[in-house]
Amino acid sequence: MSFEITILGSSGGPLEGSTCSILLKPANISYHDIINDNLPDQVLCIDAGSGMGKLTEIIHQETTTKTSYCNFLQYYPDCETVSYYYHPNVTITTPFSNFQPGRPILHTQNIFNNLQNYLISHSHLDHVCSVVINSAGFNKNMSNKILYGSHYTINAMQQHLFNGKVWPNMPSFKIVNLNYLESNRSERIGIYTVKMFDLSHGEFNKLTEDKEDAQHHSNSNSNSNNIWGKRYDRRRSSITTIPQNTSGLIIKNSEALNHHYLSSAFLITLEVPCTTKEPPPSILVFGDFESDLTSKLSRNLFIWKSIASLILRNQLKAIVLECSNCKEIAANELYGHLTPKLLIYELKQLEHECKQLDTATTSTEQPLLGLNVIVNHVKEPIADPNQESQLHDPRKRILAELNKLNEIEKLGCNISIALSGTSIIV
């Protein structure tokens, strides 16, 4: 059995409108079936940077042209066609092409009326903004929306988004429900079993300032013991302040102890009927995260150890993970993200764990051979006014670099770049 993924958004910003969100369902169930048979348990939405607006665009495009389309491929002079960015073993689909043309908003509403469950990796705006805005159009009589995430993520959404100030308190109106997931425990959600893992997405405090800013602090606080001007070499963080827990909500996650911003990965397993002889397929979807090399933690290693057996049994259909930067940059400029070399480093750790688990594997074998690696959260480049001619497609550059490193390291992975607006089967 396979999964069909519709990539509502895969951008890492700063352009809004196509940030990270995917719809996931079994490949053998169509959206027509889900709508006509009222099957909300079949669909998962992982992260919510994009939502109803983007799906409406996708449906309009597919019903009009019968083709897969990504608007970002019009933004750079060196962009290729959609198929260039996906490995040949990944099937590109158009699941909405047979919908009635001219009614994309209606079709979007019908799909969202049959979407119940969201998995939210972390509460940064580029991963949650659409579910906040879309909540004004949710029909609670059709399917009650449930948002699942870590204690820290769910608390942040209640305190800082659905707080009656930034946005109406939708949980109090029963428009959405906020549910905790516990790390490293499996929970049944619809027809899936979901296991959440902790990730590090940078540190809470900004530990580095530009030298001009540091000099300003030094001059304006000459009599104080100012730390900012002394730490140019410390890496920068995902966010710049330590969040306050002032409303009595329980924080159970380890980020409060080690000052690392908590993100999440989700291992999603499709629970097939017991009459089926096939083993249940799984897919691993990451939120934003940094390498263990950067964090000096072992959170990613724990995940690799946990999924190695799935790879050896050919049950893991794909890994969806970020690579925000198209070039190698200093650790203090990563902001809790990956580069191509750091991504390949993490895949090498996964390969090592597979070899450790399978004692029959020799050093010449490739346990990751044929593994689908789908890369998202690519950031659009910010051009210096004097270097406008160097503004090129970052997805193309990342794909080329990853394929080169994949070959050098003899990993054998099938690497693709997720394109907003497209659908694939893995």
UniProtKB/Swiss-Prot annotation:
Stretches of the chain forming a coiled coil according to its record: none
Entries under Pfam families matching the protein: PDEase_II (PF02112)
This enzyme's EC code(s): 3.1.4.17
Domain of life: Eukaryota
Record's catalysed reaction(s): a nucleoside 3',5'-cyclic phosphate + H2O = a nucleoside 5'-phosphate + H(+)
GO biological process, alphabetically ordered: cAMP catabolic process; negative regulation of glucose mediated signaling pathway
UniProt cross-references to SUPFAM superfamilies, sorted A to Z: Metallo-hydrolase/oxidoreductase
PROSITE patterns assigned to the protein according to its UniProt record, in alphabetical order: PDEASE_II (PS00607)
GO MF annotations in UniProt: 3',5'-cyclic-AMP phosphodiesterase activity; 3',5'-cyclic-GMP phosphodiesterase activity
Keywords of this entry: cAMP, Hydrolase
Chain intervals for the UniProt region annotation (Disordered): 210-229
Family statement drawn from the similarity comment of this UniProt entry: Belongs to the cyclic nucleotide phosphodiesterase class-II family.
Protein name: 3',5'-cyclic-nucleotide phosphodiesterase
Organism: Candida albicans (Yeast)
